């Protein structure tokens, strides 16, 4: 079992406390000076307890390499430009298929190889694919031939794993590799 590191504990504590402020509606009051002290103190206590028990599960020490400014800028660029472009393309494609019954729908599950090694990179790629309409990442599997994603695709354009991967992943995998590896 992993030990809880101080940066992981503090990061989890801060995230928990911000979440506490959000769900109790205290964020505006904090800035205007009208926050109820008992709610703020209760939030600190709950956040400390939550961080003490969960920090080792939520934040791995390898995640802190993201504090590199180049990686943070790349992550921001990916989210704003690369992922949004893929998201808009997929939305338009699914909307066309929904509004025009003549367009083919050929659903299926395809095996897509990936060269990503880090859990964070695989998770981000899987979630990026799932968040784009028309695709759902069903499984991430470490197999003899490497790591593969099994993706349900609304319109299977190719059954060849490499070609299907190029169509589904686009440039997302390359950008995610720059961020996490």
Residue ranges and their predicted role:
Residues 96-99, 112-114:
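Membrane-proximal, non-transmembrane interface segments of integral membrane proteins
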């Amino acid at each position: 079992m992993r030990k809880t590191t101080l940066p992981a504990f503090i990061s989890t504590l801060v995230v928990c406390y911000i979440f506490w402020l959000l769900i109790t509606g205290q964020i505006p009051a904090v800035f205007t000076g009208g926050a109820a002290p008992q709610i703020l103190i209760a939030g600190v206590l709950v956040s400390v307890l939550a961080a003490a028990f969960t920090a080792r599960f939520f934040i791995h020490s390898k995640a802190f390499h993201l504090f590199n400014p180049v990686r943070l800028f790349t992550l921001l660029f990916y989210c704003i430009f690369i992922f949004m472009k893929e998201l808009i393309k997929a939305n338009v494609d699914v909307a066309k298929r929904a509004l025009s019954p003549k367009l083919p729908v050929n659903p299926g599950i395809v095996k897509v190889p990936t060269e990503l090694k880090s859990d964070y990179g695989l998770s981000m790629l899987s979630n990026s694919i799932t968040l784009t309409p028309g695709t759902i990442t069903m499984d991430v599997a470490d197999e003899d031939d490497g790591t593969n994603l099994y993706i349900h695709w609304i319109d299977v354009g190719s059954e060849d794993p490499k070609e299907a991967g190029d169509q589904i992943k686009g440039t997302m995998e390359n950008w995610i590799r720059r961020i996490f590896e």
